From Swiss-Prot:
Function: Catalyzes the NADPH-dependent reduction of glutamyl-tRNA(Glu) to glutamate 1-semialdehyde (GSA).
Family, similarity comment: Belongs to the glutamyl-tRNA reductase family.
Source organism of the structure: Nitrosomonas eutropha (strain DSM 101675 / C91 / Nm57)
Domain notes: Possesses an unusual extended V-shaped dimeric structure with each monomer consisting of three distinct domains arranged along a curved 'spinal' alpha-helix. The N-terminal catalytic domain specifically recognizes the glutamate moiety of the substrate. The second domain is the NADPH-binding domain, and the third C-terminal domain is responsible for dimerization.
Pathway per the UniProt entry: Porphyrin-containing compound metabolism; protoporphyrin-IX biosynthesis; 5-aminolevulinate from L-glutamyl-tRNA(Glu): step 1/2
Protein name (Swiss-Prot/TrEMBL): Glutamyl-tRNA reductase
Reactions it catalyzes: (S)-4-amino-5-oxopentanoate + tRNA(Glu) + NADP(+) = L-glutamyl-tRNA(Glu) + NADPH + H(+)
HAMAP family the UniProt entry points to: Glu_tRNA_reductase
Active-site residues, record numbering mapped to chain: C50
Residues holding substrate: T49, C50, N51, R52, S105, E110, A111, Q112, Q116
Remarks, miscellaneous: During catalysis, the active site Cys acts as a nucleophile attacking the alpha-carbonyl group of tRNA-bound glutamate with the formation of a thioester intermediate between enzyme and glutamate, and the concomitant release of tRNA(Glu). The thioester intermediate is finally reduced by direct hydride transfer from NADPH, to form the product GSA.
Record keywords, A-Z: NADP, Oxidoreductase, Porphyrin biosynthesis
Site features described as Important for activity, chain residue numbers: H95
Length: 417
């Protein structure tokens, strides 16, 4: 078994590819059970965000694990192959460390990805697909991420996706305080966006969600008006800014709904930021003249602001990561010798028990205790040295020198050459 990580992210795949391999919260447990249940992998954890879908696993068949991803989403492997990255052993570990530290994010140094990785690990634990190897790797991953964030300035001056959405809205409207804002969804991303937008004091804020209770809870925090998704067709035209991020597998806002809203608004422009993957807004909506539609990838230029000033922190972070990759791979290597060490100790215990039993019998017969102890020690010595001595005598001339060096090293022998 070996560590293997594979997937797609904003570096390797466009949005229309990423949304086809995304996992919803509802499908995650089934996906994990399906992957491990087919015995393609021994352990697995899946991270699925707006910018990445990647799978970490412990497997002897990496290619079959990759094939599972395409099959699970009813895709042809050939269509997905050009966008995939596949990382084995230390490369998989380094990737995990970089992702958790925010070095692989669209928003350099962002902290949100660390929470998303922790949620992915929690899901794997709940599904029973997290074993010793992945558990140890992720624990080390979180340790490295903490060290990077506390020892470097990687997160300084970073612009989050939520902040970028607010900045973009200001560039379109100039002043958000004169606009009405509609949030669709009630998850972490919408919560972050609401904090940034509400700080600009918009005229009115509405929160729409499939579960009205969650919309109400978020509305209480931000003094907003809660509605259900079913009310969107009537409410959409009343808002100037729409920010959406749900876990819906299908679009929530279609071209027809936006056309009706624009007509009711008498063609006053409407600004929409869709941070969901899969997308909440149909791509055809971008064809409408009075709609300013931005998807998650469109925010890239804004979130890169301040990047140059943090290159020194990136170098520091990479040094920390490389050192910890070496430490973790050393732990992995030592784990491979555990069965041998255990077998060696078991054999030694058998020798001990055999000689101890023999000594007890001799003592019971009235034998001299000193002679019994000498016999016990002699018996143990002979048993412990029998195998290496036999191996040295039976080995071929070509291999003898190498074996002699190995025995000298194992037993720390010192004698004149």
């Amino acid at each position: 078994m070996q560590l293997f990580a594979f997937g797609v992210n904003h570096h390797t795949a466009p949005l229309d590819i990423r949304e086809h391999v995304a996992f919803t919260e509802e499908s995650m447990q089934h996906a994990l059970h399906d992957l491990v249940g087919h015995q393609l992998v021994k352990e697995a954890a899946i991270i699925s965000t707006c910018n990445r879908t990647e799978i970490y696993c412990n497997t002897d068949t990496p290619d079959k694990a990759v094939g599972w991803l395409a099959d699970f989403h009813h895709l042809h492997s050939g269509d997905l192959e050009p966008y995939l990255y596949k990382l084995l052993r230390e490369q998989a570990v380094k990737h995990a460390f970089r992702v958790a530290s925010g070095l692989d994010s669209m928003v350099l140094g962002e902290a949100q990805i660390l929470g998303q990785m922790k949620n992915a690990v929690k899901s794997a634990e709940q599904a029973g697909t997290l074993g010793l190897l992945l558990h140890k790797m992720f624990q080390h991953t979180f340790f490295v991420a903490k060290e990077v964030r506390t020892s470097t300035e990687i997160g300084a001056c970073s612009v989050s996706m939520a902040a970028a959405a607010a900045r973009l809205a200001e560039r379109i409207f100039g002043n958000i305080s004169e606009q009405k804002v509609l949030f669709i969804g009630a998850g972490e991303m919408i919560e972050l966006c609401a904090a940034h937008f509400v700080a600009k004091r918009p005229v009115h804020v509405t929160v729409a969600n499939r579960t009205v209770e969650r919309a109400e809870a978020l509305s209480r925090r931000f003094n907003a008006h809660p509605i259900s998704l079913g009310e969107l067709p009537d409410q959409l035209a009343l808002h100037d800014i729409v920010v959406t991020s749900t876990a819906s597998p299908l679009p929530i806002l279609g071209k027809g709904m936006l056309e009706r809203a624009i007509k009711l608004r008498k063609h006053r422009p409407i600004f929409i930021v869709d941070l969901a993957v899969p997308r909440d807004v149909e791509p055809e909506v971008a064809e409408l003249d009075d709609v300013f539609l931005y998807y998650v990838d469109d925010l890239a230029d804004i979130v890169r602001e301040g990047l140059d000033s943090r290159q020194g922190a990136v170098t520091q972070a990479e040094t920390i990561i490389d050192s910890n990759v070496m430490d973790f791979m050393h732990w992995v290597a030592t784990r491979r010798s555990v069965p041998t060490i255990r077998a060696l100790r078991d054999q030694a215990e058998q020798f001990r028990q055999h000689e101890l039993s023999r000594a007890h019998k001799l003592l019971a017969k009235g034998e001299d205790p000193v002679k019994v102890l000498e016999s016990l020690s002699s018996g143990l010595t002979n048993k412990f040295l029998h195998s290496p001595s036999s191996a040295l005598n039976q080995v071929s001339n070509d291999e003898r020198e190498q074996l002699v060096e190995l025995v000298n090293r194992l037993y720390q022998l010192r004698y004149p050459r």
